[in-house]
Amino acid sequence: MGIKSLDDLLSEGVTGRGVLVRSDLNVPVDDDGNISDPGRIIASVPTLKALSDAGAKVVVTAHLGRPKGEPDPKFSLAPVAKALGEKLGRHVQLAGDVVGTDALARAEGLTDGDILLLENIRFDPRETSKDDAERLKLAKALVELVGGEDGSSAAFVSDGFGVVHRKQASVYDVATLLPHYAGTLVDTEIKVLAQLTEAGERPYAVVLGGSKVSDKLAVIENLATKADSLVIGGGMCFTFLAAQGLSVGSSLLEESMVETCRKLLDDYGDVLHLPVDIVVAEKFAADSPAETVAADRIPDDKMGLDIGPESVKRFTALLSNAKTIFWNGPMGVFEFPAFAAGTKGVAEAIIGATGKGAFSVVGGGDSAAAVRQLGLPEDGFSHISTGGGASLEYLEGKELPGIQVLE
């Protein structure tokens, strides 16, 4: 696909040009403004640094959390601006609004190499509006900040891979108004995901966890036809176990999906692999005493919170021979130490396979958080994606609006 890259833009020369960048800076921030996982901020640095070094006047737009379309101090990008400045090693200005008087004044005062971060784009209800005309109005206001009126030299760089599956003003509509380019991050992500959907090296193993089958159904259906083995763990494995006629106690169960899982097992039984043992507890709590039971022996009064050691052993054997691996979703409640061994064991198996030459991708979201929280080496994997939802939708075979518009 003919998407222009950041290198294409830099080779045209950007000194003195206004460049609007959509970054993904949606990181976890606590009430005191502390960022527990700066992964997405770090991932946004290469594009911003390259543009700033080349003398562009950089205006960055991003969101944090899910504010209700109006300013909310809880979702201010102030702590993000500070952290971004530290990672970049240069000052990042924060506008007090999205496209208001402060943003305009600051944008007009930018000199070559300066970086201005606009306040949370989702403070403006037009960003996520379903009304095309409303979104376009906001997009035009954003374009104005980089002097992008007719005949100007302004440009748009899409670098927020975590939002490319959303048809939003700062992701989609601005790209219809300005010459557009994929930033380093988006460029890398597209190439990596293409390797997972096109003929990669075999055997191809997929590991899916997380709580709900309904969230992953389309990706299971799409990848079950492409993968040699598809490992199911996390909360969603109980709906599959129930589909086999097993009792799952008080474990998470999507009743409405049992029949769907039964059909998937009928159609792809040779590809799908379920846990054979489960770590159970009486309640969903870090201090709830844990015990391991066979998958067909879950007591009525207990819930499964992790896969057991025998499952880890079997999944490790599958993964050790794989040449291409995609992992999305934890195997258990890794936030509680007593229920983290399944996720850690499977992650270590993927790292082991990668060390032997496999191409491995961690599909964003909770899996990436688990890697960091469990103290696993991030460079043990070929690639850790920054976009959970976006990478899943890509692997489902869906068109991503934010990518489509760049083509």
Curated annotation (Swiss-Prot):
GO molecular function: ADP binding; ATP binding; phosphoglycerate kinase activity
A single cellular component GO annotation: cytosol
Keyword Signal: no
SUPFAM superfamilies: Phosphoglycerate kinase (SSF53748)
Binding site for substrate: 24-26, 40, 63-66, 122, 166
Chief localization: cytoplasm
Catalytic reaction equation(s): (2R)-3-phosphoglycerate + ATP = (2R)-3-phospho-glyceroyl phosphate + ADP
EC primary class: transferase
Binding annotation for ATP: 216, 304, 335, 364-367
GO BP term, pick one: glycolytic process
Enzyme Commission no: 2.7.2.3
Pathways per UniProt: Carbohydrate degradation; glycolysis; pyruvate from D-glyceraldehyde 3-phosphate: step 2/5
Entry annotated with the keyword Cytoplasm: yes
Entries under Gene3D superfamilies matching the protein: Phosphoglycerate kinase, N-terminal domain
InterPro entries according to UniProt: Phosphoglycerate_kinase, Phosphoglycerate_kinase_CS, Phosphoglycerate_kinase_N, Phosphoglycerate_kinase_sf
Subunit record text: Monomer.
HAMAP family, sorted: Phosphoglyc_kinase
Protein name: Phosphoglycerate kinase
Protein species of origin: Mycolicibacterium vanbaalenii (strain DSM 7251 / JCM 13017 / BCRC 16820 / KCTC 9966 / NRRL B-24157 / PYR-1) (Mycobacterium vanbaalenii)
